[in-house]
Amino acid sequence: MTQPQTQTAALLAVEDVAVAYDGMRALQGVTLAAAAGTIVALVGANGAGKTSLLRAISGIVRPERGTIRFAGSDVTRLAAHEIVRRGIAHVPEGRRVFASATVRDNLLLGAYVERDRSARERRLEDAFVAFPILRARLEQRASTLSGGEQQMLAIARGTMSGPKLLMLDEPSLGIAPKLIPEIYDGIQQIAARGTSVLLVEQNVREALRVADWAYVLQTGRVVASGDARELAESELIKKAFLGL
C-alpha cells in the first residue's frame, strides 16, 4: 500500500530517521507521513520504536540521522519548547497530570503559550465537547479523578496549546475497558475539529478502528502501512496483533 500523500505535501514528514540510546538502535531509518486533518496510528509490540519516534518528533531526543519536517519546515534540530510553538503537542504515556492542582488549572497549564484569554476559554469549551465529564470535575483536584478521567484530562490538556498535531502515547494503557471507547470518542472529536492526531497504541483493534491511516513498526522499522481499515483485515495484523 502507498502512503496517503507525498512527503512534501504532508503536515508531518519523517524521512529516514534513526535514533539510538547508549549505542542501541531504537529506530532504524523510519519514513512516514501524516496528512493534515487525519488520525494516523503507529502500532507494534513493546520495543518496536513507537515511543522513540514520538520523542524524536517532539524534540526530546535528537535523531542520529534523518529529517523531520512539519508544516513545510525542518524541525529536526529544534528544542522541544520551539516545537510546541510550531504546533506539535505530545501527551506521553502515563497521564502525568498535576495531582494537587484542579482540573481547570491542569487545563490552563496546557495553554501556557497562549496569551489570548478568549482563545483559552474557547479551547476549554472544546475540551468539554471532547470529554464532557471534565466540565463536571472542573474544580476537583486531579488526584480525585479515576484513571480514565485523568487520561481524558491529559489529552485535553494537550489540546490547550491549539496544536496542529497532537501526539498520543498509549492513551488506553491501564484504563478500565468500559472507559476506552469514551476516550477514543473524544480523540475523534478532537480530530473532527481539524487537529491531526498521531496515535501510538498497543490496543491495535481500537487504534485501527478510529485511524485513517496506519503504520506497523517492528524493531525500529516500518514493515507495513496503509488504510487503517484495510490494514486491520491484513494477515499480518490478524496474526501478529489480533490473535486471529
State each model region's role.
Residues R141-L145, E149:
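Conserved ABC ATPase signature
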Residues G66-S73, R86, A119-L124:
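Conserved ABC transporter NBD signature motif
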Residues V43-A45:
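The feature captures the beta-strand-to-loop junction immediately N-terminal to the Walker
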Residues W213, S225:
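Short, glycine/charged-rich "phosphate-handling" switch motifs in NTP-dependent
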Residues S58:
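Helix-to-loop junction immediately C-terminal to a conserved catalytic motif
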Residues G158-T159:
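ABC ATPase C-loop
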Residues L12-V14, L27:
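Conserved structural motif at the start of ABC-family nucleotide-binding domains
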Residues D22, L78, V103-R122, A130-P132, ...:
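ABC-type ATPase nucleotide-binding domains, specifically the catalytic core motifs of the NBD
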